[in-house]
Amino acid sequence: LNLKKIVKIVHLEIRKKMNIFLLQNKNKKIVILDIPLLLENKINKKKDILIFVQSKKSDILKKLLKRKSYNPNLLRKFRNIQLPLDYKKKKSQFIIKNNFTKKSVKRSIKKILNSIL
């Protein structure tokens, strides 16, 4: 089984869970979803507001290396099936610069929420 097939199978389950979650929260003003490979699997809808979280590659790698489950081969395979980051940025209505400090990310999220609501 290759990675693309695995992702397809996993995303079928993600879609089901997402739809259940959205139904359960349909009366909320705003619902936030964090879904890997969202655009790649065409899960987003036109009315969705996309937020791109931008991080330095070096910072991401530092975080990944701290994980017990880090696997460089798997990371490379996932990168190969991802859409280019520039494309994802262009499709997003907002960009958060993530320097891995809670304070700055929270500030960015508050600004976005204020402009949406």
Q: Which residue stretches match the model-derived regions?
A:
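ATP-dependent small-molecule kinase phosphotransfer cores
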Residues: 1-27
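Residue-level signal for inorganic ion chemistry
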Residues: 6, 32, 75, 96, ...
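Amphipathic alpha-helical segments that mediate coupling or scaffolding at interfaces
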Residues: 9, 63-64, 78
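ATP-dependent NMP and nucleoside kinases share a basic, alpha-helical "lid"
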Residues: 17-67
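Short, flexible turn/loop "capping" segments at secondary-structure junctions
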Residues: 43, 87-89
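C-terminal non-catalytic interaction appendages of large macromolecular assemblies
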Residues: 68-70, 78-85, 100
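Phosphate-binding beta-loop-alpha motif at adenosine-nucleotide cofactor sites
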Residues: 90-104
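C-terminal alpha-helix
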Residues: 111-116
